[in-house]
């Protein structure tokens, strides 16, 4: 199949590997700590839209998506998200780890890294910025929501 034949169709299958948290649970957490905002940083528009839909359906407020490190930092400064789902390879000169560094240092925002580049070197570069998790691509939307819910639970345990 040529790229032209594949154009126009995109799917991220989401098998029932984990159940997303109910919207009521997200609202309960939100009532205690303010709105649960998730900054989505992803330069693939279709993945960003799927991510937004899945997180919104699970009861999270989505900020973004940002497609570059610069957009991510600007949005974080404006919206003060609870956490970020960060792609590492972005459409800018700065990568997601550099954006995560700035989010962590300037705003104390921690990230879940969603990436196909999950090697020891990459993890080592990200470790100083206290990752909340790693989501290897390709991932299901159910896995995404579960990892975000786990990250929120971790943040609740350690503010």
Where are the predicted features?
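Non-catalytic signal-transmission and effector/linker regions of two-component phosphorelay proteins
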Residues: 1-37, 105, 142-159
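Conserved acidic carboxylate
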Residues: 42
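Charged docking surfaces used in two-component/phosphorelay signaling
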Residues: 49-57
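Acidic, metal-coordinating helix/loop segments flanking the phosphotransfer/catalytic sites
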Residues: 52, 65-83, 91
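Conserved phosphotransfer microenvironments
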Residues: 87-101
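As written
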Residues: 126-135
